[in-house]
């Protein structure tokens, strides 16, 4: 049985989560909602972020008759989940940095977390570290510039390896053996990050784990064939470039629609 899944992010980083879900559960209908107007979320005030997310997500749930919501954004997940779960009767899944598997994989017990400044400073992140990586030295690296580099890449623009090298230099100096990509945008730059850091550092993200969690909550069997009436739509706020629009079209979205800041369709 096909279910309706709403995936939400500030930008196109959540496409990395969406891809993992479509790979594991291709029989479901996917609606990708991204708040491009307020990108990047890692720099927003907490109450601004919470109110903005809730105002967008609640009407979209009703419109697409969602059976489950996935907040495919680390910055939003650390703040918005309680408000959404209090308002909804359907499951809400958030993305958290892969601290636990990183601590388990590390041979040196010296790991890094690369995320937005907002995620880095949140109490939730530090609770994760204390709970699952208390036996590790954890280096924290916050960057909003990497979010914009990922957005630029998705829009068809080249990624400056020189600029990326400069941004990642603090990580190189620490000699961590596992690096958590704690923002859903960052897997978009996996190849470029590996070019800078080398193959000796393991890069971890949460995509596969989120897909498995959605499978559990929907009690879905893994399928390898699309349903005849398979649906994939995208919705966005703000203005997006021609390159980004082209990327969305290559992802198989049947409809790509613009919304107002409070989730209303712009005719």
PLM region spans:
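Non-catalytic structural scaffold of enzyme domains
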Residues: 1-267
């Amino acid at each position: 049985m096909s279910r309706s899944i709403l995936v939400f992010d500030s930008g196109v980083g959540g496409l990395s989560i969406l891809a993992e879900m479509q790979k594991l559960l291709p029989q479901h209908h996917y609606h990708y909602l991204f708040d491009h107007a307020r990108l990047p979320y890692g720099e927003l005030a907490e109450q601004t972020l919470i109110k903005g997310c809730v105002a967008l997500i609640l009407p979209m749930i009703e419109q697409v008759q969602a059976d489950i919501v996935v907040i495919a954004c680390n910055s939003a997940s650390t703040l918005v989940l309680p408000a959404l779960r209090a308002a909804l009767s359907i499951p809400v899944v958030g993305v958290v940095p892969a601290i636990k598997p990183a601590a388990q994989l590390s041979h040196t017990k010296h790991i890094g977390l690369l995320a937005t400044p907002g995620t880095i400073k949140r109490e939730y992140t530090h609770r994760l570290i204390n709970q699952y990586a208390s036996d590790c030295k954890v280096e924290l690296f916050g960057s909003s510039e990497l979010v914009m580099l990922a957005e630029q890449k998705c829009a068809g623009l080249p990624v400056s390896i020189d600029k990326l090298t400069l941004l990642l230099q603090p990580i190189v100096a620490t000699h961590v053996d596992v690096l958590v990509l704690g923002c859903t945008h960052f897997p978009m730059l996996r190849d470029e990050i590996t070019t800078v850091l080398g193959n000796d550092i393991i890069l971890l993200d949460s995509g596969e784990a989120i897909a498995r969690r959605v499978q559990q909550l929907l009690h879905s069997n893994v399928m390898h064939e699309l349903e005849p009436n398979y649906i994939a739509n995208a919705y966005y706020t703000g203005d997006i470039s021609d390159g980004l629009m082209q990327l969305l079209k290559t992802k198989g979205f049947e409809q790509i629609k613009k919304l107002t800041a409070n989730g209303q369709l712009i005719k």
